[in-house]
């Protein structure tokens, strides 16, 4: 294992990103640089009761910040969670947000930061990522934001969007604004060492899904391609290590970086994995990373006729023998087996009762637009049923 101190550094892309073990100690200074004196730390209820959150709040207080805590967030955050967070922000007279946690906490916190100072009457759903909806919001009213991920998967800490569940319609909506991206990001591997192996695996596969779908998306974006393929190499090298040895700080740090790389790369686009994972998460309240991990080989198989060339290049970069889509799928299957990822959706309690509805929801999901093949609702239904039954 190499000297972990060599990973202590900073860069801008475009957020100011601080990496290294113990960098959470820099949080108060980063808040002050953004003009915060009374930040609201937003996280999920599971993390809120852990010592790490109290330690962060106490450290902020010792540095002169009046930091509050909001943790009323579901595993798949809802519009009601965001509204409650906005109320807490206003009632506590806060002036910034610390987004702390996994994808749920980060997404909810970013949405709160977006909405906290907007004009009265502006609906969160009016900012769904459709056309120029983002122009409905006042970008200058978005409050300062520092993101601190405690899982390595969603990459939401460097993203310009939040995925929020519309409970009334039972659908996940992507809320977007170009100024939602956090100004500061702290990637501290010590915050992730307590993750159980199953969560490490599921979130790590989520990072892989972002890189992989960005790699396969047909749009012209060479920078995203380069970031995506290097992100996948880091997943290959470091996810099994982080899974097997949770205290491996080098592996944990590199998975945090791979996660951020995935979310940076997918500005090129996502695809059918996410087009299916979003409705499945909304309908079954299932873990997003686990859904993408299970769906991955089935979507690659369905896209096979359109992704031959990028799969050959990917295999060569990852040193996979006999480059091609079949070999890439085999690599995914082998990785999933090492991480004890289930082979089918049925194994996590998802039945086929809503197959038609899932197909109809997937085909209109924003992620479907950048899939290499323009699947129909019936195509999505078939992919879902294959994944539900384990037919590859």
For each predicted feature, which ranges?
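N-terminal small/polar loop signature for handling phosphorylated ligands or for N-terminal nucleophile
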Residues: 48-123, 240-252
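An N-terminal, well-structured beta->alpha segment
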Residues: 1-70, 391-392
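Short, amphipathic C-terminal "tail helix"
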Residues: 352-392
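Carboxylate- and glycine-rich phosphate/diphosphate-binding segment that chelates Mg2+/Mn2+
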Residues: 158-268, 378
């Amino acid at each position: 294992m190499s000297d972990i101190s060599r990973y202590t550094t900073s860069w801008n892309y475009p957020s100011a990103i601080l990496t290294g073990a113990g960098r959470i100690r820099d949080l108060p200074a980063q808040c002050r640089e953004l003009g915060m004196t009374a930040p609201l730390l937003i996280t999920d209820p599971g993390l809120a009761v852990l010592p790490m959150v109290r330690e962060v709040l106490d450290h902020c207080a010792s540095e002169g910040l009046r930091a509050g805590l909001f943790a009323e967030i579901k595993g798949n955050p809802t519009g009601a969670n965001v509204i409650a967070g906005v109320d807490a922000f206003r009632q506590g007279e806060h002036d910034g947000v610390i987004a702390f946690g996994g994808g749920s906490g980060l997404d909810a916190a970013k949405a709160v930061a977006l909405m906290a100072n907007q004009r009265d009457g502006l609906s969160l759903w009016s900012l769904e990522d459709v056309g120029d909806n983002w122009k409905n919001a006042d970008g200058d009213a978005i409050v300062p934001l520092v993101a601190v991920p405690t899982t390595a998967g969603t990459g939401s800490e460097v993203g310009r969007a939040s995925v929020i569940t519309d409970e009334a319609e039972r659908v996940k909506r992507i809320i977007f604004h170009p100024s939602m991206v956090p100004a500061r990001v702290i990637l501290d591997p010590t915050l992730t060492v307590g993750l159980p192996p199953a969560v490490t695996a599921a979130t790590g596969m989520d990072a892989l899904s972002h890189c992989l779908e960005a790699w396969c998306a047909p749009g012209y974006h060479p920078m995203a391609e380069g970031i995506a393929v290097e992100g996948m190499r880091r997943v290959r090298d470091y996810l099994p290590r982080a899974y097997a040895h949770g205290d491996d700080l080098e592996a944990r740090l590199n998975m945090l970086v791979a996660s951020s790389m995935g979310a940076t790369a997918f500005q090129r686009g996502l695809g059918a994995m996410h087009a299916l994972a979003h409705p499945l998460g909304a309908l079954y309240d299932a873990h997003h990373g686990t859904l993408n991990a299970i769906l991955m080989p089935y979507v690659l198989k369905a896209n096979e006729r359109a992704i031959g060339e990028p799969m050959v290049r990917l295999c060569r970069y990852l040193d996979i023998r006999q480059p091609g889509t079949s070999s890439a799928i085999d690599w995914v299957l082998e990785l999933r087996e090492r991480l004890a990822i289930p082979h089918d959706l049925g194994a996590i309690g998802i039945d086929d009762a809503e197959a038609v509805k899932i197909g109809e929801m997937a085909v209109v999901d924003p992620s479907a637009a950048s899939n290499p093949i323009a699947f129909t609702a019936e195509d999505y239904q078939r992919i879902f049923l294959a994944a539900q039954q384990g037919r590859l």
